[in-house]
Amino acid sequence: MQRLQICVYIYLFVLIVAGPVDLSENSEQKENVEKEGLCNACTWRQNTKSSRIEAIKIQILSKLRLETAPNISRDAVRQLLPRAPPLRELIDQYDVQRDDSSDGSLEDDDYHATTETVIAMPAETDLLMQVEGKPKCCFFKFSSKIQYNKVVKAQLWIYLRPVKTPTTVFVQILRLIKPMKDGTRYTGIRSLKLDMNPGTGIWQSIDVKTVLQNWLKQPESNLGIKIKALDENGHDLAVTFPGPGEDGLNPFLEVKVTDTPKRSRRDFGLDCDEHSTESRCRRYPLTVDFEAFGWDWIIAPKRYKANYCSGECEFVFLQKYPHTHLVHQANPRGSAGPCCTPTKMSPINMLYFNGKEQIIYGKIPAMVVDRCGCS
């Protein structure tokens, strides 16, 4: 009997001593599991962020129909950018990304970017344009962005050098044609007279929409144009071939085009901020820096807020389609789990150089994640 009591005391002593140790170990193990879970979540989120950046680079090139990023250096951009009013307005009043998250709508737009403005710089002169032993300005080539869209406006911009005294300037735009029997090589497009005062040079725009439309219908008739801006003394003030200190003063075409309006559809989803403690599917902030890529061919924006989706998806949590949960309940082993994906995206406007060194202003669809959900 005494021996039995001793055994009981020993057993109770072991329980008393071992109990706290066991609880302490369980607590420590739980804490380690939680820390490991947080580390795994951070790693997963970082991988998702990196994948999102790479996907954005691929999407931009694909949506702009570019096989590779245009090889245009920062110095080349400075030389090619016209110092002209229309471009300055685009840059100064640039709307980096539209804030329309409040209406819950999502444009049912095409995959590719839609063009709004094209700034075409003079291209290399064709042999047919060799007149009097030297090339004449200017010859413009047009990409499919102009050819397959409706032209709303077309302006030829020319820069007139400053004058020392008040003078009247006669501006004439001529279109090069195939030589006629009488030797005629040019036919008039537009002419105007304007008064200039001493001071800085000025930009002058001329409407060439009709001419451009004819060129698009009959590409073989596009042999180029000649620009003259003579003052009262017969001096040509038009900058056609920029000299020293005249970078960015080339003539150029500003063409505005329009696309078919797109329909809209309604879409709603969870939108969480970066400070949320929610561990499940949500949106996280992500800023894409084009300069960090070395993409100097993008004029604006230099960076934009793209955002990305990350987090866990349970079968009953914010599923995009109600039948997803029912399918899983019917066959839990045979159905894949829902994924955390964007449920609402919006476009960004972009000003960039294409492969032909033309400046394009357009809209790229589905580049900003506004909301995330499980589907």
From Swiss-Prot:
SUPFAM superfamilies: Cystine-knot cytokines. GO terms for biological process: myoblast migration involved in skeletal muscle regeneration; negative regulation of myoblast proliferation; negative regulation of satellite cell differentiation; negative regulation of skeletal muscle satellite cell proliferation; positive regulation of lamellipodium assembly; positive regulation of macrophage chemotaxis. Transmembrane segments: none annotated. This is Growth/differentiation factor 8. Coiled coil: none annotated. PANTHER family: GROWTH_DIFFERENTIATION FACTOR 8 (PTHR11848:SF150), TGF-BETA FAMILY (PTHR11848). Residues 19-266 form a propeptide. InterPro entries: Cystine-knot_cytokine, TGF-b_C, TGF-b_propeptide, TGF-beta-rel, TGFb_CS. The keyword Aminoacyl-tRNA synthetase does not apply. It holds the Pfam family TGF_beta. The lineage of its organism: Eukaryota, Metazoa, Chordata, Craniata, Vertebrata. One of its GO terms (cellular component) is extracellular space. It is found in: Secreted. Disulfide bonds join C281-C340, C309-C372, C313-C374.
